[in-house]
């Protein structure tokens, strides 16, 4: 099973990836988290920490953008990497290592833009996920419908997760 997470930056995709991975592991599955957000500073590191806490392995072959003293810098020798290749390669690894569920954490933006949607579509087309979950902050307010429509048109999501409802 391949699950792709999509949504705006800060919506809770990375945290959901860890929670979902933990729940699946606890239910007897063998999940793999995939670090395909190579643009947000330290996103790969965050997913690695979340995966470690959940006891779920993380496929993170590229460092993505790192931050150094509060300033975003690219990892040595790369700008941010190729998230489509990371996602595609993770599926092959999952088949080889017998992971039964792959959870792909994708990049977000502060707002909807064509670059974000193109990257999400490219990942979707490369891995053909069973589920595309649109993750949205429950506190987003008036912008929720517009954002949901944009993601539905952009990646044709199959489910919605409202995040940050736990207090």
Where are these regions (language model features)?
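P-loop/Walker A NTP-binding module and the surrounding RecA-like catalytic core of P-loop NTPases
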Residues: 1-167
């Amino acid at each position: 099973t391949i699950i792709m997470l999509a949504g705006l930056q800060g919506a809770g995709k990375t945290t959901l990836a860890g929670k979902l991975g933990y729940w699946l592991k606890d239910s007897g599955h063998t999940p793999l988290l995939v670090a395909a957000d190579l643009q947000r500073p330290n996103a790969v590191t965050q997913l690695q920490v979340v995966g470690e806490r959940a006891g779920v392995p993380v496929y993170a072959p590229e460092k993505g953008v790192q931050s150094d003293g509060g300033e975003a810098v690219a990892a040595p020798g790369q700008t941010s990497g190729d998230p489509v290749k990371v996602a595609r390669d993770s599926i092959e690894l999952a088949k080889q290592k017998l992971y039964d569920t792959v959870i792909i954490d994708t990049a977000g933006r502060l707002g909807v833009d064509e670059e974000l949607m193109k990257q999400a579509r490219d990942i979707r087309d490369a891995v053909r996920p069973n589920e595309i979950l649109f993750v949205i902050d429950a506190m987003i307010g008036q912008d929720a419908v517009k954002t949901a429509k944009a993601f539905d048109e952009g990646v044709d999501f199959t489910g919605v997760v409202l995040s940050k409802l736990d207090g």
